[in-house]
Amino acid sequence: MTLILAIIPVLLLIVLMAFFKMSGDKSSIISLIVTMLIALFGFAFSVDNLFYSFLYGALKAVSPILIIILMAIFSYNVLLKTEKMEIIKQQFASISTDKSIQVLLLTWGFGGLLEAMAGFGTAVAIPAAILISLGFKPIFSATVSLIANSVATAFGAIGTPVLVLAKETNLDVLQLSTNVVLQLSVLMFLIPLVLLFLTNPKLKALPKNIFLALLVGGVSLVGQYLAARYMGAESPAIIGSILSIIVIVLYGKLTASKEEKARKSTLKTKDILNAWSIYLLILFLIILTSPLFPSLRSTLENNWVTRISLPVNATTVNYTISWLTHAGVLLFLGTFISGLIQGAKVKELFIVLWNTVKQLKKTFITVICLVGLSTIMDTSGMIAVIATALATATGSLYPLFAPVIGCLGTFITGSDTSSNILFGKLQASVAGQIHVSPDWLSAANTVGATGGKIISPQSIAIATSAGNQQGKEGEILKAAIPYALAYVVITGIIVYIFS
């Protein structure tokens, strides 16, 4: 009975969004209320625990998630205000007029780099917004951005998910990182192919799409494997994305038509740098404050810190914000400074920021309710009930379903890192019981979690906010589900065969 009750919030959310086509904010409010009632009466959760669990979830929603979403969309809106987005659009067109190459470059290449550096929604929001400005349909832009924001998530935010997994399981980070890359290897070829096919599904484009997918997937795999094997979790996504960008740009230039090659760009280097100054400065600040510079990061992390302690389940949960290394703050600084460089006035920038807040009000409601829901499911024991039931039911076939648990974690929480916190220990424990390598099975949690990112309601809320498409969450979820299912099935087969 408890298993049925535990599953209800997840099923309800999917049904409301995908089949009743209810907006994200309304779906999440209803699902949150039902989850609270189940926790109170089905899991004997006290009112105090319920209140503090929701408060903890709401705080986690505001920071880092909502602050980062707000600042990511703010950066895009500033580019519109200063009219520098037109220069960025012209530059993408100068690289290639081929829509497939533009989509792959923006979502897999640039989006992968944003995920590697910052994570928490930037890799969905910014590429989707730029694609829309290039003339792509909002639903298409949201869907391809979600699908692309999968593989890189494993090592997002400078490797945070795998670093957390290593800490939770007490396993070697180099071995975990290497296993994650190996389990994702097939997807590194398939995801670029899917992106190319969705952009241009014509049969005559298939040979070109396959060749480019093999090329991009190959450099991603080699780069990520070497980085994971010899450097750890911090750099695989960064190196893989940079190599992908280089290969895609070179391919676009080399395969351009004679007319494209003859057409000279009218853009000056100064104008290009000025237009890109927002993202260049943001990347610079993110790299500067990342674990790549441990002494500086340590100094910044220990200054201007907000700490809040909350009593949940007879223990104390700690909520901490290090403002000087906060990705949202870095996004704001990079955007604000670059906005001034691009000619905007201080007052104009604050008006743009306020308009962005108003634009995202439904997204704020959706994300706060979803993270509150996931936190209540965690602290009341619902998630543990679902995961344990799956592990018990599958027995020796468990490795086939291990990625499903990771996927479930990300679907509920919206975060690969949170999924690893919830289920990392469980995966390692089951591995010992069925005589499978804990390193291999724990890595499968992260790999499954990357697939869950495609259909996470939080990620979908970010994608809809980027294109001002609030209310279309159900449509995007239905479009994304088949790809997420295929993703988890493929990774499950890989994990099972080599376990």
Which residues does each predicted region cover?
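Membrane-interfacial loop-to-helix junctions in multi-pass transporters
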Residues: 3, 60-65, 92-106, 134-140, ...
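Membrane-core helix-loop-helix motifs of multi-pass transport proteins
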Residues: 146-251, 461-494
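Hydrophobic alpha-helical transmembrane segments of multi-pass integral membrane proteins
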Residues: 98-129, 133, 364-377, 394-426
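Structural signal for alpha-helical transmembrane segments and their membrane-water exit/capping regions
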Residues: 2-3, 13-49, 71-82, 248-257, ...
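Alpha-helical transmembrane segments of multi-pass membrane proteins
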Residues: 100-112, 138-151, 172-188, 192, ...
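Short helix-coil transition sites and intra-membrane helix breaks within transmembrane domains
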Residues: 63-65, 76-83, 113-123, 151-159, ...
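Flexible interhelical linker loops that connect adjacent transmembrane helices
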Residues: 202-214, 255-274
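Transmembrane helical segments that form the transport core of multi-pass membrane transport proteins
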Residues: 240, 259-406
